[in-house]
């Protein structure tokens, strides 16, 4: 597929301004420390506005009141989003209690947002609280380093509670990969943790002085679950086990979902299989993929800079051979693996270690005390008594992990009393949205605030057609950057303008096919009318066990995307 249009290894031309910024930043320091003391604005100025992203933060404002503040001649209400580095989504109950307190005491919204990258975010951190949040995280063994911008982001790992030993091994590799690919600059420690400046020169042996051309995402996957949506990621290690023990990984490279509306040089792409590698080569291969993308990725056009575009430009075999050369290995043929699903199994599951795991459905990952459903308080009370850990899933849910039989009833009572185990439909469990309005500066349409009521309407359609217990993997993302992973859904809505979305159909339940645009720039009533007709047909005409996405392809309703670089827009 990728050998059709091999191009230059390096794209020549004028570098993007982001490259200048990184080069001049003194290894990500900029003037952030000085800017922190500027009380005349609630935001960060100049390059610092972008540099703080390398430190795990985005500058945002409340878009619900932006126009009102402008009328009053006030600057936007600037506040930061902070995203924690949490490989595999594992967090101790001590850490949870600390983040709960910070959210309550020091953020505008008072909530904790679980993300589909297995971590948590704080929204609404005022500038005066930015340094304290980093220091709070450090005090409990956490940080926000490299969770945004042109680095290897938070490393995902399947939250599989059944295969306890395999999960433990895979999780250790997720942590090792995360640590190995971290930036070496001391900027984070100097600015946020008040560590002394050292006379030595900074070096970045893996990432380089200008870091990566674009964001880079990595996963460790344990089949048959594809809960982490490997095809949304640049580099994926698929666990291969023998007799229940991890022996190596299949490597898949070049997935990614972000596009730009109308820009046919951009496309969503599934990851390509490179081959199998024994465990001992994991870090060398991870480094080789990252450094190849570092050196060959497009630094002249950020919209064409991700690994998926590099792979298409130079050709899969060329990229693979370079990874082999740098890692000093030859990939073995891909070992057999298959995926059967990617949803979370809500409720109690017993692990092979005889401990119990309770997966709680958290709609859109937003942890807050709602009227009659004090979710945030409930999780805090569980954290106070639970001796195990919490695991954040890539479906924005939360697992109370490793609960001994003796504690099970007590934890279930707390969960039920706080509305954490309320019954929800299969459709709601399989629906997801990004944050979007009011805090995301890129949002074009509502997502998190739109999805709950939209799901109600889709549930009504399923009931109308006699299949109330069925589900369709449904995702809403507020803009084409695609944080809601709509480009791997059976029904994907991509925000185009307030109240308007592009409707994508034809993905599948296991997340291995990109959905094609079916209708463009349509309103909610139009979307529901289309879904009513198509779900009605699915209910009547489907084959045994056939998911909605597979049905739309088989019935000729939508053409499957087979070669995204060439047929995503056709």
UniProtKB/Swiss-Prot annotation:
Reaction(s) this enzyme catalyzes, per UniProt: hydrogen sulfide + 3 NADP(+) + 3 H2O = sulfite + 3 NADPH + 4 H(+)
Cofactor binding note: Binds 1 siroheme per subunit. Binds 1 [4Fe-4S] cluster per subunit.
Species the sequence originates in: Salmonella gallinarum (strain 287/91 / NCTC 13346)
GO molecular function: 4 iron, 4 sulfur cluster binding; heme binding; metal ion binding; NADP binding; sulfite reductase (ferredoxin) activity; sulfite reductase (NADPH) activity
UniProt-listed Enzyme Commission number(s): 1.8.1.2
Keyword Iron-sulfur assigned: yes
Family annotation (Gene3D superfamilies): Sulfite Reductase Hemoprotein, domain 1 (3.30.413.10)
PROSITE patterns membership: NIR_SIR
Family note: Belongs to the nitrite and sulfite reductase 4Fe-4S domain family.
Stated role: Component of the sulfite reductase complex that catalyzes the 6-electron reduction of sulfite to sulfide. This is one of several activities required for the biosynthesis of L-cysteine from sulfate.
Coiled-coil zones: none
UniProt-recorded name of the protein: Sulfite reductase [NADPH] hemoprotein beta-component
Subunit structure: Alpha(8)-beta(8). The alpha component is a flavoprotein, the beta component is a hemoprotein.
Cofactor(s) required for function per UniProt: siroheme; [4Fe-4S] cluster
Keywords: 4Fe-4S, Amino-acid biosynthesis, Cysteine biosynthesis, Heme, Iron, Iron-sulfur, Metal-binding, NADP, Oxidoreductase
Enzyme class: oxidoreductase
GO biological process, one term: cysteine biosynthetic process
Gene: cysI
GO CC terms in record: sulfite reductase complex (NADPH)
A Pfam family matched in the record: NIR_SIR_ferr
Keyword Membrane: no
Binding, siroheme: 483
Pathway it works in: Sulfur metabolism; hydrogen sulfide biosynthesis; hydrogen sulfide from sulfite (NADPH route): step 1/1
Binding residue positions for [4Fe-4S] cluster: 434, 440, 479, 483
Signal peptide: none
